[in-house]
Amino acid sequence: MAISLFEHNRSAYRAVREMLEATGKAAVIHPTGTGKSFIGFKLCEDSLNSIICWLSPSDYIFRTQLENLKDSSPDTVLDNVKYFTYARLMNMTEDEIADITPDYIVLDEFHRAGAEYWGAGVQKLLSAYPNAHLLGLSATAIRYLDNQRNMADELFDGNIASEMTLGEAIVRGILNPPKYVLSIFSYQESFAKYEMRVKKTQNKAVRDKAEKYLEALRRTLDKAEGLDVIFNKHMTDRT
């Protein structure tokens, strides 16, 4: 069974194919959790006669993506993908890079390719294969702690096939809105410090008043739910 994409990824994939055909470069900037990797996997599936070089920040990330692919499309086999981490690429020799011979290069979390050493490895690969089509996937194009560098501009010449903000993904129902839960835990040490300060108060009237406040605070804290209760109440789906 072929890889099936959700509508937001289908439209992004169509834009990717058109942009790759026109410019050879395409970036997709979608929030985490929207299934960006499936856009890359669909490109691999539709290009089985081509060699895909897939670069990822870590083995764990790529392994998790493959597990998600297997869950949704168990019959899909992508033997045309050569996978490397950015760190592995950084240390590859020219001969090893020459053995890759990619028709397509996928840069997952492409903003990471702006790092000094990882970026050098990516540039070495791109220089070796200037005609390979380049697809980038990331939740952001900006390296905020690196002079606000825009990696979509640097790597893809500004060719962004699809861009979606976190707010848009929530409004469109692609992602669930966040749920914030405020609670107090591990307060015993702080409470003991307040008790000690109250006991050392010389003025009896002030001390008596403070002790009343402390007792009221203690009763309130005793009624507070523990972390186990909070997790069970608000984290109903832990699969």
Can you describe what each PLM-predicted range is?
Residues 1-27:
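Conserved pre-motif I regulatory segment
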Residues 16, 39-47, 121:
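Hydrophobic residues on the short alpha-helix immediately C-terminal to a glycine-rich phosphate/catalytic loop
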Residues 22-43:
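Walker A/P-loop
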Residues 51-58, 238-239:
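Conserved RecA-like ASCE P-loop NTPase motor core of nucleic-acid helicases/translocases
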Residues 58, 85-88, 137-141:
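A short beta-strand-to-loop transition that corresponds to the Sensor-1 phosphate-sensing loop
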Residues 62-101:
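Inter-Walker segment of RecA-like/P-loop motor cores
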Residues 97-143:
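SF2 helicase catalytic motif II
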Residues 146-238:
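Interdomain helical connector at the RecA1-RecA2 junction of SF1/SF2 helicase-like NTPases
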